[in-house]
A protein has these predicted regions:
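Cell-envelope/extracellular polymer assembly enzymes that use nucleotide-activated donors
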Residues: 5-8, 26, 36, 185
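Short, well-formed alpha-helical segments that are part of the catalytic scaffolds
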Residues: 15-29
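A conserved acidic beta->alpha catalytic loop
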Residues: 26, 41-50, 92
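Short beta-strand/loop segment that forms part of the nucleotide-sugar
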Residues: 34-43, 63-68, 93
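Glycine-rich, basic loop-to-helix element that forms the pyrophosphate-binding segment
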Residues: 67-83
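Donor-binding/catalytic cores of nucleotide-activated saccharide
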Residues: 72, 93-200, 205-226, 233
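Short aromatic/hydrophobic "clamp" motif used to bind/position activated sugar donors
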Residues: 88
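Membrane-interface aromatic/basic loop that binds lipid-linked glycans or pyrophosphate carriers
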Residues: 269-333
Length: 333
């Protein structure tokens, strides 16, 4: 492309063959036209790379970057390195977007623009901000509501529009050492340097909900929780000067509570053995900061099981197993 595009759409691709064509087609049929698409083939073995190449031959807005497999965080970082647009948008390779997606993201000139998502697949549902809201860094706490089921700033790297210069000039990257929720860390790093934010009441992003595999469940561990917590703690220390201690306390507590919820939701899945479950919970209890995290759970009825799991891990595990067995028996009867 002879001139710099307004938007760079970065799509990490890894064995998404069954969904890839729908994904790319949804991007090419946008009402907003000034963009490039970077398809980052992360060592696919199912022909996804060839699908990407075939689209690039037909549309000059598409660039394909082939690389060895190193995970989605690495693929997104590779896309950032090659992005030419003034702004960056991330779209996962198995998702789809409406034809107004990019147009809506360009309604504001804020450093960060956030919209909602429409979930489909294993789970369904639509979540989006209720109305347009423009705000600065000083109002961050008001949009980081501990009692809210959805935090549009915290979750996802998709359904957002970032400013490329902020990312590149400050060396903001996806942490390639993390197994899950690397988007959380990327977003927090970005907030250290962004001044203006806009939430928009759209749900143009189609987020495909995939079932977690047995292997992924076994990879979830206390060590992963520790890595996340320690990395986020560094972000929180830097945020202190920008938003003050009161706002920081709200952001910190809410973010860590959501992280803890995710950790235990993985541990309570089918397929986790009692040995793995107890080992992870006991290791978590040994952490110097586990008391702080557990204090966040006080009074939260929906996660009472987590509190009991920390106090009585083996009993809690077998209680869960027994309850699931009863439910299965009744449903089959």
């Amino acid at each position: 492309m002879s001139t710099r595009p307004t938007l760079s759409v970065i799509v990490p691709v890894y064995n998404t063959g069954p969904y890839l064509q729908a994904n790319i087609d949804s991007l090419l049929f946008q009402h907003f036209k000034d963009f490039e698409v970077l398809l980052v083939d992360d060592g696919s073995s199912d022909g996804s790379g060839a699908i990407c190449d075939s689209y690039a031959e037909k549309d000059p807005r598409i660039r394909v970057l082939h690389k060895e497999n190193a995970g989605s965080a690495s693929a997104r970082n590779h896309g950032i390195d090659h992005a030419c647009g003034e702004f960056i948008v991330f779209v996962d390779g198995d998702d789809i977007v409406t034809e107004d997606y990019l147009l809506h993201l360009m309604e504001s000139d804020a450093d960060l623009v956030v919209t909602g998502v429409r979930k489909f697949g294993a789970k369904t549902g639509t979540t989006a901000p209720a109305r347009r809201d423009d705000f600065g860094i000083g109002a961050l706490a008001a949009h980081w509501n501990l009692s809210s089921g959805v935090n549009y700033l915290y979750c996802y790297q998709v359904a957002k529009r970032f400013r490329t210069d902020i990312i590149k000039e400050n060396g903001i990257r996806f942490d390639e050492s993390l197994f899950f929720s690397e988007d959380m860390h990327f977003n927090m790093e970005y907030y250290l340097h962004a001044d203006s934010f806009t939430e928009l009441p759209y749900a143009d992003y189609g987020y495909r909900m995939m079932r977690i595999t047995r292997d992924e469940k076994y990879r979830m561990s206390e060590a992963q929780l520790a890595t996340h917590f320690e990395s986020l703690d560094s972000c929180f220390r830097h945020l202190l000067d920008r938003i003050g201690p009161d706002t920081l306390s709200i952001v910190r507590d809410d973010t860590n509570l959501r992280l803890l919820r995710k950790f235990y939701s993985f541990l309570m899945q089918d397929g986790i053995t009692s040995r793995v479950f107890v080992r992870n919970v006991m290791a978590f209890r040994e952490r110097s900061w586990s008391g702080y995290l557990m204090s966040l759970l006080q009074g939260k009825k929906e996660i009472r099981v987590m509190r009991e799991a920390v106090r009585f891990p083996l009993l809690t595990y077998w209680t869960e197993v027994r309850l699931k067995s009863i439910v299965n028996h009744v449903s089959q009867g």
